[in-house]
Structures are given as C-alpha cells and as structure tokens.
Amino acid sequence: MLSSKLLKSLTAGVFIIGLGVTLAYAAADDQIKARQAEMKGNGKAMGALAAIMKGEAPYDAAVVKASLDAMAAGDAAANEAKAWDASSMEGATIETWAKPEIWAEGSQVGAKYQAWVDARTALAATTDEAGFKAAFPALGAACGGCHEMYRKPKG
C-alpha cells in the first residue's frame, strides 16, 4: 500500500502534468484564435479595398489607410501571440484551416509573407486612385498565393 506522503506526491505530480497539458492545449488554441482573428481582420480590410477596386465604393485615401493600418495591427498582434509558430499545431483542440505544410522544411511561407508585407507597403505609398488601382492587385495576389498553398478548404 502506498504511504500517504507518496500518494500525495503522485497526486500532485499527476495534477501538474495534467495542468501542463491543459495549458499547452490552451496556448495552442489561443495561438490559433489569434491567427484566425488576423485572417478575419485581413478579410474585412480586403473587402473594403476590393470594393474601391471594383468601383463599388469611391476611392477614399482614409479608407485605404485604415484598412492597411488594420492589417498591420493584426499582423503585429498575431506575431506577438506567436500565432504562426509551429507550436500552434501541438495539442490544439479547435479547428484550423492552416495546413501543416506551412511549417515544413522548404516551406515558401516566409517568402509569401514578405510578398504580402511588400504589397501592403507599396499600396500604402500610393497617393491617388490610379496608384491604388495599379498597386492593389499585388496585394490580392499575395493573399491568394499563400492561401492556395497553405490554407485548407473551409467546410
């Protein structure tokens, strides 16, 4: 029979291990939620920008700036939360559309991310509707290029 002291130690050890596993799951889930929040915010911003591009909304430099600022803020928040770290896939309990290939050796995700940052920067440098319409397609292509390779189909 186990001594009371040994039983308490084992119980505490099991509790600590369980807590660690729970925290790992919670951390991974929080990372995925941060990643999803970034993508949702980017989608909203892209919707506003696409409406201008399609002529569904008038060109408005303030809307362009606010949309790009929202993307940059979402990116910074996701980076702070380590939303794109491979650890976000370890022990997650919520669904994600991110493919594991993002973190595979030889992944092009870093180059795709840089193309998105560069396209955002170029669009932010535009000063009028003509410049916006010339620069916007690169941003859409950067988003789509990453999604085609690294996002699972939704549904």
Regions of interest found by a model, annotated:
Residues 29-155:
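Sequence context surrounding c-type heme c attachment/ligation sites in exported
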Residues 19-27:
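Sec/Tat signal peptide C-region and signal peptidase I cleavage site
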Residues 2-13:
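Bacterial N-terminal signal peptides that target proteins for export
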Residues 14-18:
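Core hydrophobic alpha-helical transmembrane segments of single-pass membrane proteins
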